[in-house]
Amino acid sequence: PVVAVCKELRASCEHELRFWCDRKFGASARGIFGKFDETIPVELIIAGKVRRYHGKSMVFHLHPSILLPNIRDVFLVGIGFIQSFCKLLRWRPDVILIKGGYVCLPVGYAARLLKIPLVLHDSDAHPGLTNRLLAPFAAKIGTGAPLEHYNYPDVKAEYVGIPVAEEFRPYSAAERRQLKVKFGFDPARPLVVVTGGGLGAARLNEAVIVMREQLLAETSVFLISGKHQ
């Protein structure tokens, strides 16, 4: 979605664009933007995240394997805030687009301190922690799902959907049949493609496996799974 937004901005204005991400995604981000526009620099921000497991007890969250990384990451968020503040102080952008994720938290707070406008986009049906924390400071909020799924203020929130690049288009019936044959599926049966996030989603994968007999009774299923998922 970010690439789709950058393409539209490139086509409509000549402003300088920069993409910031967590260190873990630096290589993949540079590869993606290298194919699209090498003039957009990819810069890395130090960040930490809060490990929360819904439905688990407080005792579970106090286990050293969870507690210690969370304590460490509090300091990483602080470092990321200082890093973001210094970068923004030098660059002074007109606006910052926040797409969610823990790396956006220190950036958002630094922008708030420097009074740089924030625009949030929430692709998820339920807002993540970072977007919930930054929403009070945002000038505008775009959502991927209808507004009734969110608690964002109506005065600043708008249902805009998911940004999709022009290269992604609906396939014709003939093209869909050809692809089914190419991947070994019956072209006469409906095909359900299931994928969950960049690395797959373990719970989604498990649900598909549990329901496989029911699904396969009526459709073909193509499950795309991340490594170790």
Regions flagged by a language model, labelled:
Residues P1-R10:
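Short amphipathic alpha-helix
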Residues A11-L76, E158-V160:
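Conserved nucleotide-sugar phosphate-binding/catalytic loop shared by glycosyltransferases and other
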Residues E14, F19-W20, F25-A27, K49, ...:
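Donor-nucleotide binding loops and adjacent catalytic segments primarily
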Residues K24-G31, E148-N151, E167-F168, H228-Q229:
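Short, charged/polar "capping" segments at the starts of alpha-helices
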Residues I32-D37, I82-L97, L105-V119, R132, ...:
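Glycosyltransferases and closely related glycan-assembly transferases
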Residues T39-I40, R112-A174, F185:
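Active-site-proximal region of nucleotide-activated glycan assembly enzymes
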Residues N70-C86, A174-Q178:
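Glycine-rich, highly charged phosphate/nucleotide-binding loops
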Residues L76, G100-V103:
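Short, solvent-exposed amphipathic helices
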